[in-house]
């Protein structure tokens, strides 16, 4: 249970500090998003969020937290993480245009019960993002490989993009337990 090792979790902040500086030094005005286990310093447990950090201009900040925490099959995220209540929209000025980027983490996309046959979650980040009028949907995932899962992921992703009527940037892990 690496997520229970406080020093390991705290070390990721030092690595992010250095990575943000290195990226800025080498690439200048480049923005990068990464997934992290965000520590919350209070007396409640679990004291982590599954979060997205934005690295840019030599610094980093949290821009999104996971809303839907799966607890089925290989997933037991409620054991380690808190659930965020609100969707995250990052407003970026790029080449004289203002962009509203809606961020989701993995399961936050899986809200259409017709696709997979599972019950719909009580929370619906995709519906909430529609109210925020995002221009682009970004999903960071770390989904393990499963036979024929790519086809299902494509359907889920397509549903979200069509529902929001925006392009989707979908990023999944490689290596590790992705075979």
Predicted segments with their positions:
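Enzyme catalytic cores with a strong preference for nitrogen-chemistry domains
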Residues: 1-179
